Amino acid sequence: MLALRPEHHDSITLRIEAEPAAEAEDADDALAGAEMLTLDLTVQHGDALKAAARKALPKQKDIEAWIAPALFADAQLNVRFVDEEEGRTLNHTYRGKDYATNVLTFSYAETEDDPVAADIVLCCPVVEQEAKDQGKPLRAHYAHLIVHGALHAQGYDHEDPAQAEEMEGIETEVLAGLGFPDPYADR
């Protein structure tokens, strides 16, 4: 389903369904036992984001394709692309850090049983500079950070080494399945 939200000229709502991989003897058995996951995805662009910057951003269908294999539950996600000022304001307001960061995830689930619902905010100038500094294609860096944000939305974190290893392993596996290199290979 594709629906334009007329009250937001810069938003598109897209609903997709994905099937998690299942171990089965053949494809028919796998499909019969597979649970369908649903993603309600909205993409927004900050008002101050310049038109030239918007042209370099991933398309809705790409974002959908990157998030789907990283989902382990139904999800309602909003991906928002912002300029440096909005990114810095959000990081300062919600994390007490007075600088723009590459990605922020605001998860609205209060318990593990709550549905996955979150805003994933990407600061375009920071993402672009990081990709340049790290010698990575911008598309690959956006894919990585969007998958990273989707995992945060589902409760994954990287506060300690064991958590980081688990989360980075999932990111690497998802990105490899999408044809992107290991984002942590150069460490």
Swiss-Prot record:
Zn(2+) binds at residues 148, 152, 158. Pfam families: YbeY (PF02130). Its EC number is 3.1.-.-. Its main location: cytoplasm. Keywords: Cytoplasm, Endonuclease, Hydrolase, Metal-binding, Nuclease, Ribosome biogenesis, rRNA processing, Zinc. SUPFAM superfamilies: Metalloproteases ('zincins'), catalytic domain. It is found in: Cytoplasm. Belongs to the endoribonuclease YbeY family. Single strand-specific metallo-endoribonuclease involved in late-stage 70S ribosome quality control and in maturation of the 3' terminus of the 16S rRNA. This is Endoribonuclease YbeY. The gene is ybeY.
